[in-house]
Curated annotation (Swiss-Prot):
PANTHER family: HEAT SHOCK PROTEIN 70KDA (PTHR19375). Disulfide bonds: none annotated. Keywords: ATP-binding, Chaperone, Nucleotide-binding, Phosphoprotein, Stress response. PROSITE patterns: HSP70_1, HSP70_2, HSP70_3. This is Chaperone protein DnaK. GO terms for molecular function: ATP binding; ATP-dependent protein folding chaperone; unfolded protein binding. Belongs to the heat shock protein 70 family. The gene is dnaK. The modification Phosphothreonine is found at residue 198.
């Protein structure tokens, strides 16, 4: 069995870890970084992921996709998506089934397809370290992700060529990372996870009995559209408003300027965690008839705090709900762990510390803890980590729509998973031969206020007065938190195998098509790498030849020089194209044409090695070297 890796698929950054010698180890990517920006750029030639995509974002804003996690498993008409449509430089569109998709380089793409590019980078990082192919992974998601978002994350894994062995909640993973080496007795920890795009709070009890550790999630809550990106957007809005006030120009209509503004806002926000004032200085941000315009704005930590005060307060509300759901008070919490890059902001730490009335743990790396926890869970699944039991919960209630557009819950939120539940329902009309079962997820009484997970029909019900037929609906949640639903007509005793036709998400056929597309791109990428290699070799050959021509000077006959220059021109023309064979052929021809030049260079080198009269003979071979002892003679005249 191959190794199972742990991946933190983040909104802003992603991270991969693996068990190495029994310890979870975060792996460095090809650029030498322990985290990879969750940014994907589409160019005419290739797909860039991570730092290389981030570097070119300013010049290619409409085809550079970031924070894709905010769209995964969401409908285009969702309020959260509509908020992003206006501020993202790339184009968010509605797919045929109503899902939120992205359009880049004229191609329409599903969020799982884009997320798969990040997962492929994580997979490659692990393969480079392990020296073997990786096909299995544990992937983390926000605890408050609904069924559609979890399904979409698993789809992303499949498209990337990974079998997702387990979907694990991010705060639970962080608690695993924190508690795995701490063998003391019972401990109740609160994990406050404020990442790039999502927020979670989980209350987790860590028990250690007879060497076995149990991590039991007591309650979880959160907001899947609250994170560092929202903090950045407040800063961007402030800077754009200040510029408009001063210059009368609205930068929001210029994608290039907005991308520069985004980078500057993020940088300023990070700086203000360690300093009390910073300056955003963007020369030539735009221009009008009077000439170029520059943006120079001083911003203090206090100003930033006032811009995001309501966002921080918003994160405290789920804390109250989670504590109430767990039937605990703040005094029952032993430790508070902060996870996610946005928790580095001093004001966030201050507010969370004040809420719980205690000091925060400083020994957890907010960027790496989740990936480490995922690697530990991977070790549990593979049998490498023993005596660890993880009991997670479903974050939201699950049920079906019943008469009067009411949601009837079958499984309450914060129920330990995996779990099963069933309930018997009946018909609303006389002689009704079919019922539609509408599956919902959420906490509202009115069905329209909840997330629709899909619906299906149970047909062939025998004619009977209303209320007589007995229809049993069974819900089954697996360890990934993903729901399976079945319905049975108890009168006939015949269970019908019914699959929910999801109202959103990718069909199996679409996922398979995307897997094939990804495989085709893998071949394309390999060919592109080979092409670049050939180009580099050709460029190197031309550069070396030009240098040798200069050094040869008059020693190179004119007709030979002409022949070589013609061959060099052919190489330079071939390099501009995409024909690898043509590049290699022209490079070979240049090598052959340069044979006379090589002879001259070799003759010159040999001449330089020869020794003119009067010079000392070359040193003997090392075997003839005689060791001598020297005695230091002091100069008394010093």
């Amino acid at each position: 069995m191959g190794r199972i890796i742990g991946i933190d698929l983040g909104t802003t950054n992603s991270c991969v870890a693996v068990l190495d010698g029994g310890k979870a180890r975060v792996l460095e990517n090809a650029e030498g970084d322990r985290t990879t920006p969750s940014i994907i750029a589409y160019t005419a030639d290739e797909t860039l992921v991570g730092q290389s995509a981030k570097r070119q974002a300013v010049t290619n804003p409409t085809n550079t996709v970031y924070a894709i996690k905010r769209l995964i498993g969401r409908r285009f008409k969702d309020d959260e998506v509509q908020r992003d449509v206006d501020i993202m430089p790339f184009k968010i569109i509605s797919a045929d089934n109503g899902d939120a998709w992205v359009e880049a380089q004229g191609k329409k793409m599903a969020p799982p397809q884009i997320s798969a590019e990040i997962l492929k980078k994580m997979k490659k990082t692990a393969e480079d370290f392990l020296g073997e192919e990786v096909t299995e992974a544990v992937i983390t998601v926000p605890a408050y992700f609904n069924d559609s978002q979890r399904q979409a994350t698993k789809d992303a894994g499949r498209i990337a060529g990974l079998e997702v062995k387990r979907i694990i909640n991010e705060p639970t993973a962080a608690a695993l990372a924190y508690g795995i080496d701490k063998k003391q007795g019972d401990n109740i920890v609160a994990v406050y996870d404020l990442g790039g795009g999502t927020f979670d709070i989980s209350i987790i009890e860590i028990d250690s009995v007879d060497g076995e550790q149990t991590f039991e999630v007591l309650a979880t809550n959160g907001d899947t559209h609250l994170g560092g990106e929202d903090f950045d957007n407040r800063m961007i809005k402030y800077l754009a408003d200040e510029f408009k006030k001063e210059q009368g120009l609205d930068l929001r209509n210029d994608p290039l300027a907005m991308q520069r503004l985004k980078e500057a806002a993020e940088k300023a926000k990070i700086e203000l965690s360690s300093t009390t004032q910073t300056e955003v200085n963007l020369p030539y941000i735009t221009a009008d008839a009077t000439g170029p315009k520059h943006l120079v704005v001083k911003i203090t930590r206090a100003k930033l705090e006032s811009l995001v005060e309501d966002l921080i307060k918003r994160s405290l509300e789920p804390l109250k709900v989670a504590l109430a759901d767990a039937d605990l008070s703040v005094s029952d919490i032993n430790e508070v762990i902060l996870v996610g890059g946005q928790t580095r902001m001093p004001k966030v730490r201050e507010e969370v510390s004040a809420f719980f009335g205690k000091e925060l743990r400083q020994d957890v790396n907010p960027d790496e803890a989740v990936a480490i926890g995922a690697a530990v869970q991977a070790g549990v699944l593979s049998g490498d980590v023993k005596d660890v039991l993880l009991l997670d919960v479903t974050p939201l209630s699950l049920g079906i729509e019943t008469m009067g557009s009411v949601m009837t819950k079958l499984i309450e939120k914060n129920t330990t998973i995996p779990t099963k539940a069933s309930q018997t329902f009946s018909t609303a009309d006389d002689n009704q031969s079919a019922v539609t079962i509408h599956v919902l997820q959420g906490e509202r009484k009115q069905s329209s206020g909840n997330k629709s997970l899909g619906q299906f029909n149970l047909e062939g019900i025998e004619a009977a007065p209303r209320g007589m037929p007995q229809i049993e609906v069974a819900f089954d949640i697996d360890a990934d938190g993903i729901l399976h639903v079945s319905a049975t007509d108890k009168k006939t005793g015949k269970a019908q195998n019914i699959t929910i036709k999801a109202s959103s998400g990718l069909s199996d056929e679409e996922v398979e098509a995307m897997i094939r597309d990804a495989e085709a791109h893998a071949d394309e990428d390999a060919k592109f790498e080979e092409l670049v290699k050939s180009r580099n070799q050709a460029d190197g050959m031309v550069h070396a030849t030009k240098k040798q021509i200069e050094e040869a000077g008059e020693a190179l006959p004119a007709d030979e020089k002409e022949k070589i220059e013609a061959a060099m021109a052919n190489v330079e023309t071939a390099v501009k194209g995409n024909d690898k064979e043509a590049i290699e052929k022209s490079t070979q021809e240049l090598m052959e044409a340069s044979s006379k030049l090589m002879e001259i260079a070799q003759a010159k080198a040999q001449a330089e090695q020869g020794q003119p009269e009067g010079e000392a003979k070359s040193a003997k071979p090392e075997d003839d070297v005689v060791d001598a002892e020297f005695e230091e003679v002091k100069d008394d005249k010093k």
